[in-house]
Amino acid sequence: MAIVKKKKVSAASKAATEKPEVKKAVKRPVAETEAVTPKKKKLVKKVKKSAKKAHEEEPIEQVEKLQLIDDDEDGLEGLSFPGSDDEDLRDDYSDDDSDAGDHLPIEKKSAALDKQKEKIIAEGEEELQLNIANQATFELPTVEEIENEMKSVPNLEIVKQRIADVIQVLGDFKNRRDPQKSRENYVEVLKKDLCSQYGYNDYLMGKFMDLFPNGAELLEFLEANDNPRPVTIRANSLKVKRRDLAKNLINRGMNVDPAADWTKVGLVVYDSQVPVGATPEYLAGHYMIQGLNSLLPVMALAPQPGDRVLDMCSAPGGKTSHIAALMKNSGVLFANDANFTRCRAIIGNLHRLGVNNTVVCNLGGEEFSKIRPNGFDRILLDAPCSGTGVIWKDQSVKTSKDSQDVQRRHTMQRQLILSALDSLDANSPNGGYLVYSTCSVLVEENEAVVNFLLERRHCELVPTGLSIGVDGYTRFRDYRFHPSLSMTKRYYPHVHNIDGFYVAKIKKLSNAKMSKQGVMEKEKEKAAQKSQNKKNKAEAEASESSDDEEEKKNGVEVNGQKKPAKKQQQKKQKADGDDSDDDNNAPMKNIGSGARANKKRRNQKKAAEKQAAVKEDDGFNTVGNVKRAKKPTQFKSKVPKRAAARTGAKSVKNRRKKMLAKQQ
């Protein structure tokens, strides 16, 4: 008994250490377990008492390791130890999932993903609340403060954050605005910050803000202008197929892939171990280094073998060689450029690429309408422009282009497009098409020029046949263009990952030139004006007749005497004058009717009145109280200017002298 008292404190720990022996006793056959000694019964009772005390003193985790159930016959079947069959059954059907070690690996991964997802959601909510708090405290600086800040070196991080804040405010202006600030204030601050961040002048930044009212899209466009486009090449179908060229270049150490689904000759170069412009394939004329945007106007032109084609601004010859490849070196192709030094580049590229149906010209584009009017089936005009679509190639465009430069380009483009259309043959069996393109995104150089052509010539816009691109503008701020301009295509670097570009395809309807305003519009205006004139004339006649009737009835009272109306007096004086001055009015007879006849009558009537005034005048003109001799009235010669030029100045002087003598 004394030994039992000593072990009373460590009974729970002893039960845990004797766990394997108890487990073996549970698994023994029934024959062995039936023989239970009294000592073992006493030991079980003591273990129960110690377990109760341990349950009161120790944590719950240690108590769960030993569970005793009373009222068992043998005293051992009520014991449930870890690893027993009863515990396995309890774990399988229990809702208690505190034991994480029993989960399958896929369940553990799923739980980890759920925790990670909850963490991300919580972080996003915290960030959202933080942004809302920052937006609530955002204060818009004045333009003067920003200008003072720009005088020194600006902190680009602060400027970038302010741009983001202003764009967010403009996106939800009603709820986030400062009541004391207008939208113009926010836009002005945004414009100043964008100019400071990206290095543009005010004019270009204003144009881009008009093109992209959405602030997020504007930032994407500005970022794309600072990043170069992928290097692309065009396979020369006159010498090699694109598939064979790609294999050869891959063997050279170049990583190339087909550029896009809409082109069959384009390849994009991701990286290269050799210079792209110095491979044997390049020197042999198997490909041309060319941007994907320059493939679009040639695809829209769609030249056919045997056509007469003009590339009005062709340097350095990429589009010209592409046209020759589509024509299969047949027909006649004129490659023109106004710059003589650039014509040398055209000749070199055409020789290298194997083009032999081309005539290289060095003329101004405006001269072709005089040299070969109606002489081409198809014309490509890639007009000189401001280059706002390829800013990544020339960063000086950001500051060098202003309103005057764009206006000069606009005027030149209008002259070139008129000359190009006049050089087209509208009666060509499969031609009469003009493709106008620029590497600019400004409306003044694109839609405005094409709309000008539609108003001046017999032509119409047709679909370009290109599967990609954004439709052109029909309404842009103060501009209102022809609805068919929606068939033109625009390309942006941040949308299509190519240089900014514009393509329009025009069909010539007639070789006859329209008037300045346009024949169709002029006829409509004439009809409208004619109907309006008739209406006004009818209203005037009705009002005059009503006035005459009132004057006839009422007359005019002067000094209490009723006199005839003014119009009646004029008619009476006119009739009296006609009767008395038959000799003076004799030359006015049988002149005829019409505007010229009326003019002659008026001139002759004035001359007769002057003659009558000379007869009645005493020859003096009173100025104040002094009489001055009045010069005799000199009459101009009745001889027209052209007749006077034929007869000479002497005959005119003689006639004037004779007329003065007759008057005296």
UniProtKB/Swiss-Prot annotation:
What SUPFAM superfamilies does the annotation carry?
Answer: S-adenosyl-L-methionine-dependent methyltransferases
Please indicate which superkingdom the organism of origin belongs to: Eukaryota
Please name the GO terms that the record assigns under molecular function.
RNA binding; rRNA (cytosine-C5-)-methyltransferase activity
Recorded hits in PROSITE patterns, A to Z, give: NOL1_NOP2_SUN, SAM_MT_RSMB_NOP
Location comes to:
Nucleus, Nucleolus
Q: Where is the composition biased (Basic residues)?
A: 38-52, 563-572, 627-644, 652-664
Active-site residues, record numbering mapped to chain: C439
GO biological process terms, alphabetically, are:
cuticle development; gonad morphogenesis; maturation of LSU-rRNA; negative regulation of cellular response to heat; negative regulation of locomotion involved in locomotory behavior; positive regulation of egg-laying behavior; positive regulation of fertilization; positive regulation of multicellular organism growth
Q: Where is the composition biased (Acidic residues)?
A: 84-99, 541-550
The catalytic activity of this protein is classed by the Enzyme Commission as: 2.1.1.-
InterPro entries per the UniProt record, alphabetical: MeTrfase_RsmB-F_NOP2_cat, MeTrfase_RsmB-F_NOP2_dom, Nop2p, RCMT, RCMT_NOP2, RsmB/NOL1/NOP2-like_CS, SAM-dependent_MTases_sf
Signal peptide range in chain numbering: none
| Alphabetic keyword roster | Methyltransferase, Nucleus, Ribosome biogenesis, RNA-binding, rRNA processing, S-adenosyl-L-methionine, Transferase
- Disordered: annotated span: 1-105, 513-664
Disulphide bond pairs? none
- Main localization is nucleus
**Binding positions for S-adenosyl-L-methionine?**
C313, S314, A315, P316, G317, G318, K319, D337, D382
Quickly give the catalysed reaction.
a cytidine in 26S rRNA + S-adenosyl-L-methionine = a 5-methylcytidine in 26S rRNA + S-adenosyl-L-homocysteine + H(+)
Q: Cellular component per GO?
A: nucleolus
Q: Where is the composition biased (Basic and acidic residues)?
A: 53-68, 519-528, 606-618
Q: What happens when the gene is disrupted?
A: RNAi-mediated knockdown in L1 larvae results in sterility. RNAi-mediated knockdown in adults results in reduced egg-laying. RNAi-mediated knockdown from day 0 of adulthood or in the germline does not affect lifespan. RNAi-mediated knockdown in somatic tissues reduces lifespan by 10% and reduces body length and results in morphological defects in the gonad leading to the production of no oocytes. RNAi-mediated knockdown increases resistance to heat stress and increases the speed of locomotion.
Q: What does this protein do?
A: Methyltransferase which methylates the carbon-5 position of cytosine 2982 to 5-methylcytosine (m5C2982) in 26S rRNA. May play a role in the translation of leucine and proline codons. May be required for the translation of specific mRNAs such as mRNAs involved in gonad development, collagen production and cuticle integrity. Plays a role in ensuring the correct localization of the germline-specific protein gld-1 during development. Not required for pre-rRNA processing, the production of mature 5S, 5.8S, 18S or 26S rRNAs or global translation. Plays a role in positively regulating fertility.
Q: Which NCBIfam families does its entry note?
A: nop2p
User: What is the similarity comment for this entry?
Assistant: Belongs to the class I-like SAM-binding methyltransferase superfamily. RsmB/NOP family.
Name of the molecule in the record: 26S rRNA (cytosine-C(5))-methyltransferase nsun-1
